Swiss-Prot record:
Post-translational modification: Phosphorylated and destabilized by ASK7/BIN2.
Gene label: WRKY70
Annotated source species: Arabidopsis thaliana
Cellular location(s): Nucleus
An example Gene Ontology CC term for this record: nucleus
Tissue: Expressed in leaves and flowers.
Cross-referenced SUPFAM superfamilies: WRKY DNA-binding domain (SSF118290)
Biased composition (Basic and acidic residues): 79-91
Region (Disordered): 72-94, 201-229
Name this protein carries in UniProt: Probable WRKY transcription factor 70
Molecular function in Gene Ontology: DNA-binding transcription factor activity; sequence-specific DNA binding; transcription cis-regulatory region binding
């Protein structure tokens, strides 16, 4: 170590001398005259001596250089990235958080932005958010792939209207789809024909009609249940209730073409063997669905 200190002192002296000689050269250049060549030669000798001294320095061990580098990182990255001393080297125990002075590059997903008048594409999306954007006229909507939780697809997209052309949408796709697009999207149970009729007349719904339809959907229904008895109650309630806007009439001795599809056995369910006629075609759909329940 003493040898290195002596060499360091010699290098400093040579550099100071070279600096002084260069200053003198600058002064001589401003005055045309003699002594320039000798001064330049001295400067060259001074720098050559400095270089030769630097070449004789002992090489720094790799462990020392590693400790110096990690020490500088520890000083700039705070104490969140903990180190353990082990002789001349230090081992990192945990990851360094991305704080000031520690630049941690984050991997970003692939993005693609297009402008289109059509929002639909070949994939299935579900909207999960919307927010107002600063200095923007229109809000931005956020969508995720429908199969995010079923197939782990992380693809998302952002949709926002173009200010200068409100009919156009700026669509940004983030990430690639990893889902199987051929897989069926989970759908809610579709209502059968009876449920649709029941919902269409929701304002005028009948408790008896609701009961009969629930029994139709029950897979554990026993044979010989009281469905026919319920339908016998539904029939007069549907036809003769004043709250309904449909007009129905009971006619004896006359056959209606709209009721021909009902057999004699179906008519027995409703407690009558006569013929019926309806003023509107939509009555037929209601009564035919009720006959199918029997």
């Amino acid at each position: 170590m003493d040898t290195n200190k002596a060499k360091k002192l010699k290098v400093m002296n040579q550099l100071v001398e070279g600096h002084d000689l260069t200053t003198q050269l600058q002064q001589l250049l401003s005055q045309p005259g003699s002594g320039l060549e000798d001064l330049v030669a001295k400067i060259l000798v001074c720098f050559n001596n400095t270089i030769s001294v630097l070449d004789t320095f002992e090489p720094i061990s790799s462990s020392s250089s590693l400790a110096a580098v990690e020490g500088s990182q520890n000083a700039s990255c705070d104490n969140d990235g903990k180190f353990e001393d082990s002789g001349d080297s230090r081992k990192r125990l945990g990851p360094v958080k991305g704080k000031r002075g520690c630049y941690k590059r984050k991997k970003r997903s692939e993005t693609c932005t297009i402008e289109s008048t059509i929002l639909e594409d070949a994939f299935s999306w579900r909207k999960y958010g919307q927010k107002e954007i600063l200095n923007a006229k229109f809000p931005r909507s956020y969508f995720r792939c429908t199969h995010k939780y079923t197939q782990g697809c992380k693809a998302t997209k952002q949709v926002q209207k173009v200010e200068l052309e409100p009919k156009m949408f700026s669509i940004t796709y983030i990430g690639n789809h990893t889902c199987n697009t051929n897989a069926e999207t989970p759908k809610s149970k579709t209502c059968d024909h009876h449920d649709e009729i029941f919902m269409d007349s929701e304002d005028h719904k009948s408790p008896s009609l609701s009961t009969s339809m629930k029994e139709e959907d029950n897979p554990h229904r026993h044979h010989g249940s009281s469905t026919e008895n319920d339908l016998s109650l539904v029939w007069p309630e549907m036809v003769f209730e004043e709250d309904y806007h449909h007009q129905a009439s009971y006619v004896n001795g006359k056959t209606s073409t709209s009721i021909d599809v009902l057999g004699s056995q179906d008519l027995m369910v409703f407690g009558g063997g006569g013929d019926f006629e309806f003023s509107e075609n939509e009555h037929f759909s209601i009564f035919s669905s009720c006959s199918n329940l029997s």
